[in-house]
Structures are given as C-alpha cells and as structure tokens.
Amino acid sequence: METASTPEATGTGKYIASTQRPDGTWRKQRRVKEGYVPQEEVPVYENKYVKFFKSKPELPPGLSPEATTPVTPSRPEGGETGLSKTAKRNLKRKEKRRQQQEKEAEALSRTLDKVSLGDTAQIPSALQGPQATPLAASDPSDSAATTEKAKKIKNLRKKLRQVEELQQRIQAGEVSQPSREQLEKLARRRVLEEELEDLELGL
C-alpha cells in the first residue's frame, strides 16, 4: 500500500498525490491549502502521565536486562512442589488414614461375606473396635432413604385425600360433569392405596 506523500507545491497551491487504499482502490489526487498536514501524519495526543510512563524504563535503575531472565525453580526432592514440611507430613498422614480405612472396609466386607443374615449373634468381636465406624458412616444414607420414604408416603396420602375430596364433591353434586383428568384421578385411587401400603410396610 502506498502512503500519502507530502504535499507537492505547484503554481496554484499544494496537492496530495493519489494513493492506494488497503482494499486496492485508488484515492484521487487532492488539492490542499498551505500548511495542511494529512490526518495520518498528525501526532496522537498524549497527556503528561502517558508520556512519563512511556519514557520510564521497565527495569529498576542499575538492573541489566540479562539479569532479569526467568529462573526455573529446581524441584524439591519429595515429589510435591512448593509444599512445606508440615504440609508434606499432613499429606502422608491423610494417605495412611485413607489406606487404613480401605483395609478396614475390606476386612469388614470379608467378614460380612462369611456371616449369613441368620447368624447375627456370631459376629466377630473385631467388628466392635475401630471397624464399627464404617457401619456408623452408612447410617446417614439410611436416614436419607428413610426421609425419602416418609416424603413419598406424605405425598401419596395427600393425593389420596385429593381423590377422596373429589369423589365427595361428585357425590354431593358440586361437580356435575367431571373432566378427563378428574376421572383418571379417581381411577388411580386403588394404585395409590397399594403403593402407600407397600411403602408403609417397607418402613
């Protein structure tokens, strides 16, 4: 791309020669007044702070650019990078604890495989010690399942109550022409009762 050349003096004034645009088209030659500066050559205004920071060196005084090359840190001997001794010790403790829990869980599963459901009185005394904690840990999941069942029971009772109310309204004559959904609700009553019975027996 050709850039705008400086205005050329002719007999009647100055001209800016024709130039090529970035897209390949040509600008016409233009006649300009005395003292005209093309837009591309006008310096961009910079306030004093911008000028100060541009003139300011990036490095502190007296520091050579060679001294600022980044240094790659050497890896510490214990595989974890950047950890203190205490943090490494804590990691080792956690790892040992995790391995211990895995061993306890394996031992518990082996003893549970050996013991049948009918022989609950013959559970080894080894389970009474530290291995009783995995059983206690499973209690929250059991309680979550129990609360889930309780919610389902409550929901089913609510649906049954709605079905009974609908049936009473139909019998009282409040609803003369029940809609299709209402009839489906009435038809589902037996299924809801059976499901409620199953859940209550499961608790």
UniProtKB/Swiss-Prot annotation:
Compositionally biased intervals (Basic residues): 86-97
GO annotations of cellular component type: cell junction; cytosol; exon-exon junction complex; nucleolus; nucleoplasm
Superkingdom of the organism of origin: Eukaryota
Chain positions found as Phosphothreonine: T72
Modified residues (Phosphoserine): S64, S116
N-acetylmethionine PTM sites in chain numbering: M1
Molecular function GO terms recorded: ribosome binding
PANTHER family named in the record: PARTNER OF Y14 AND MAGO, PYM PROTEIN
Subunit details: Interacts (via N-terminus) with MAGOH and RBM8A; the interaction is direct. Associates (eIF2A-like region) with the 40S ribosomal subunit and the 48S preinitiation complex.
Name of the molecule in the record: Partner of Y14 and mago
Gene field: Pym1
